[in-house]
């Protein structure tokens, strides 16, 4: 009797422990300077997952019998191929280890295993509140840097010093929007305050790609949740901002100032002979096989070939600035196909629950993950080479949402 009671008490703590690990993992994911603690969380997640799988090995394989996991597995295998063809296999494997083995493949495995016994409603709440906490902590950490800058006489919106936070601002943005869907007026007031704070930080990145991603995600969110009044208010605000920018058109601000970025209409040397244009030229020279995985491989090939193309804007590589081009360059046509397969699987999984019947609720996790994916990988990934590892957070939660 006593043994049975102790066993039951241990089982009661298991879901709390599992949920806490997943929550902490997402909440701290974008924080800098706490690498050892983030590694500790991952280690605890791995140990817990291994223990639970060993206790009931036959109950876990069904979690991964679907196109989302298959697409993750295919991309992982294709990137193994890209290591084998790499001129620097050591660097390619290091990149593979960071982004795949310790990145999206690991996250895709761990999250659904740890949340296996949770309902869709519980998983949806973890998604929302872990994203919100992560966004809050990221903004809090960045505010400290702004204070330090101010003490040095550096004002906001005049340098690219805060550009590094744009990834987290785009990836986590849909969670902020979902606060509006809570019915209490007090919470809606909190939403307005938090939105003003968010606007400060996103403008401070001086990243037009991030701005565009946030704009598109915001419009999609409002349409899918039928928030027509917010669309009207947003359109008015954009018109006012646009008018203010136009009135300042004759001013010639510093290229690292906010006003300059708002007025800028060119592509920042992305296309013809720029970052993406040159990446496309290199891909055309070897579209089937690819060159090998890793930023160092790309830089090496680019820097070697730039002497043959005197019209290229950048004499040293600064990357392809496009996620799809990066994978295509790395693994050839198979890499492109596998990435498209993964993107398609995610869109299909989220759209099956999102576009068919939109549930106007702050806990609509499928819609939140869909918008996070679109903003970060489809829109921002078209202007920057975004971190592929984070896609494992999306796929991991999507698999967890299939449990029940």
UniProtKB/Swiss-Prot annotation:
One BP annotation, GO: lipopolysaccharide core region biosynthetic process
Q: Enumerate the transmembrane spans.
A: 16-32, 39-55, 67-84, 96-115, 127-147, 168-183, 189-221, 228-246, 324-343, 363-379, 385-401
Any one annotated GO CC term: plasma membrane
- Pfam families per UniProt: Wzy_C
Question: Which pathway does this chain act in?
Answer: Bacterial outer membrane biogenesis; lipopolysaccharide biosynthesis
Keywords for this entry? Cell inner membrane, Cell membrane, Glycosyltransferase, Lipopolysaccharide biosynthesis, Membrane, Transferase, Transmembrane, Transmembrane helix
Q: What is its EC number?
A: 2.4.99.26
Annotated signal sequence is none
**So which domain of life are we looking at?**
Bacteria
- Glycosyltransferase found in the keyword field: yes
Q: What are the disulphide bonds in this sequence?
A: none
> Mind telling me which InterPro entries this protein's record contains?
O-antigen_ligase-rel_domated, WaaL-like
Specify the protein's topology with respect to the membrane.
Multi-pass membrane protein
Q: Where does the record place a coiled coil? A: none
**Molecular functions (GO terms):** glycosyltransferase activity
The reactions it catalyses are:
a lipid-linked O antigen + a lipid A-core oligosaccharide = a lipopolysaccharide + a polyisoprenyl diphosphate
- Described purpose of this protein according to its UniProt entry: Transferase involved in the biosynthesis of the lipopolysaccharide (LPS). Catalyzes the transfer of a polymerized O-antigen molecule from its polyprenyl diphosphate membrane anchor to a terminal sugar of the lipid A-core oligosaccharide, finalizing the biosynthesis of the lipopolysaccharide. May also be involved in a feedback mechanism to regulate O-unit synthesis, based on the availability of O units on the periplasmic face of the membrane.
User: What family does the Swiss-Prot or TrEMBL record give for this protein?
Assistant: Belongs to the O-antigen ligase family.
Q: What is this protein called?
A: O-antigen ligase
């Amino acid at each position: 009797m006593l043994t049975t009671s102790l066993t039951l008490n241990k089982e009661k703590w298991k879901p709390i422990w599992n949920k806490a690990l997943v929550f902490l993992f997402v909440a701290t994911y974008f924080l800098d300077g706490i690498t050892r603690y983030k590694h500790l969380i991952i280690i605890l997640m791995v140990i817990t997952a291994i223990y639970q799988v060993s206790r009931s090995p036959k109950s876990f394989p069904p979690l991964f019998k679907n196109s989302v996991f298959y697409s993750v597995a295919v991309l992982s295998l294709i990137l193994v191929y890209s290591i084998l063809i790499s001129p620097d296999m050591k660097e390619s494997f290091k990149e593979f280890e960071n982004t795949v083995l310790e990145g999206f493949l690991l996250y895709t495995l761990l999250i659904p295993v740890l949340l296996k016994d949770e309902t869709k409603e519980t998983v949806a709440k973890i998604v929302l509140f872990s994203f919100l906490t992560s966004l809050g902590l990221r903004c809090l950490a960045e505010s400290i840097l702004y204070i330090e800058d101010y003490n040095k006489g550096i004002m906001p919106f005049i340098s690219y010093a805060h550009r590094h936070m744009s990834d987290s601002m785009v990836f986590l943005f849909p969670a902020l929007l979902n606060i509006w869907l809570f019915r209490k007026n007090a919470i809606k007031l909190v939403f307005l305050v938090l939105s003003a704070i968010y606007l400060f930080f996103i403008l401070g990145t001086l990243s037009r790609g991030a701005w565009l991603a946030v704009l598109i995600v915001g419009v999609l969110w409002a349409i899918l949740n039928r928030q027509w009044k917010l669309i009207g208010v947003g359109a008015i605000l954009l018109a006012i901002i646009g008018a203010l920018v136009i009135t300042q058109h004759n001013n010639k601000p510093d290229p690292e100032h906010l006003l300059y970025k708002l007025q800028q209409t060119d592509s920042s040397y992305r296309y013809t002979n720029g970052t993406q244009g040159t990446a496309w030229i290199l891909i055309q020279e070897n579209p089937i096989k690819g060159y090998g995985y890793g930023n160092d491989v790309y830089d090496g090939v680019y820097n070697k070939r730039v002497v043959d193309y005197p019209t290229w804007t950048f004499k040293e590589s600064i990357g392809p600035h496009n996620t799809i081009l990066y994978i295509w360059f790395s693994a050839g046509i198979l890499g492109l196909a596998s990435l498209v397969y993964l993107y398609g699987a995610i869109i299909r999984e989220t759209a099956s629950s999102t576009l068919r019947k939109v549930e106007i609720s702050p806990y609509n996790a499928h819609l939140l993950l869909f918008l996070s994916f679109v903003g970060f990988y489809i829109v921002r990934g078209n202007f920057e080479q975004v971190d592929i590892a984070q896609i494992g957070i999306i796929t991991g939660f999507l698999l967890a949402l299939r449990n029940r």
